[in-house]
């Protein structure tokens, strides 16, 4: 129903100190399809962050002391994105379609917000907000009025990613929203990811489902348990052979890439 939902993700880049004044700017560039794009910059003495207006997508987080990049550089040979926001669907629908109000609608994986130009609404020294509004084209795929707001706030060695979904209509707004950040790993120039892993705060074991690579649909009958050592699971040669690890429920509130 009419109203709004607010969510926040916190990315922390550790072992960084001596933070002072933040400032913001922007520059214009042409993408690989010769499309005119805007990239906005948030910067302090420690981090430099870049966000595209297209998809309001986080594209770069660099440690300024040594120009170390934390984010995946969107090599299209493997995966041509860096950190798309998934809206109004997370994942795939069966046959890439769904029914609502007696009608069938076609929609691609992860919705459409990541593939649309967002409007920069406000910008301060340390914070920037973008917005995306429903229009005639989105209504063809998703028959709901909405306002999606995506914000980024730079504070010390942390980048806060904020979402706000507003419903300007009186009918219930059905949606899902998700993050899809990709981080550089290995981080220090190693030849493999062995020795790196994930830490799930407060957990002794992790329960997850898998999915089918050809459709992306979850295999809900599959319940896999990963034992954790000191809250961690380390990457093995076959760790990423599985398409996706689907972790349901509020098992933890913090996941870290560790080495």
What annotation goes with each model-predicted range?
Residues 1-37:
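N-terminal amphipathic/basic-hydrophobic helices that include classical n-h-c signal peptides
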Residues 23, 27-100, 104-107, 250-259:
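Beta-strand-rich N-terminal accessory domains
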Residues 32-35, 89-91, 111-116, 143-147, ...:
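Short solvent-exposed loop/turn micro-motifs enriched in small/polar/acidic residues
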Residues 40, 128-130, 148-150, 161, ...:
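Hydrophobic residues positioned within well-ordered beta-strands of beta-sheet architectures
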Residues 104-156:
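Extended, loop-rich substrate-binding clefts of extracytoplasmic carbohydrate-active enzymes
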Residues 134-181, 187-188:
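Acidic, contiguous internal or C-terminal segments within carbohydrate-active enzymes
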Residues 182-185, 189-259:
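Active-site/ligand-binding surface loops and adjacent short beta/alpha elements
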């Amino acid at each position: 129903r009419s109203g709004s939902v607010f969510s926040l993700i916190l990315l922390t880049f550790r072992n960084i100190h001596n933070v002072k004044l933040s400032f913001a700017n922007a520059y214009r560039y042409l993408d690989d399809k010769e499309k005119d794009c805007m990239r906005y910059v948030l910067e302090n003495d420690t981090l430099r962050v870049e966000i595209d207006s297209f998809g309001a997508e986080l594209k770069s987080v660099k440690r300024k002391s040594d120009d170390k990049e934390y984010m995946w550089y969107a090599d299209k040979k493997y995966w041509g994105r860096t950190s798309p926001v998934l809206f109004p669907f997370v994942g795939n629908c069966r046959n890439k379609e769904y029914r609502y109000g007696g009608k069938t609608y076609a929609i691609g994986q992860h919705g459409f917000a990541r593939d649309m130009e967002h409007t920069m609404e406000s910008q301060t020294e340390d914070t920037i907000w973008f917005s995306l509004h429903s229009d005639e084209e989105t209504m063809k795929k998703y028959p709901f009025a909405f306002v999606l707001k995506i914000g980024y706030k730079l504070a010390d060695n942390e980048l806060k990613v904020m979402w706000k979904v507003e419903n300007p209509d009186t009918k219930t707004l059905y949606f899902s929203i998700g993050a899809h950040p990709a981080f550089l790993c290995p981080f220090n120039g190693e030849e493999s990811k062995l020795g790196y892993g994930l830490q799930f705060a407060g957990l002794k074991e992790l329960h997850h489902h898998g999915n089918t690579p050809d459709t992306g649909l979850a295999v809900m009958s599959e319940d896999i348990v990963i034992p954790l050592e000191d809250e961690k699971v380390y990457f093995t040669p076959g760790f990423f052979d599985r398409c996706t690890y689907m972790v349901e429920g509020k098992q933890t509130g913090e996941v870290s890439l560790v080495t």
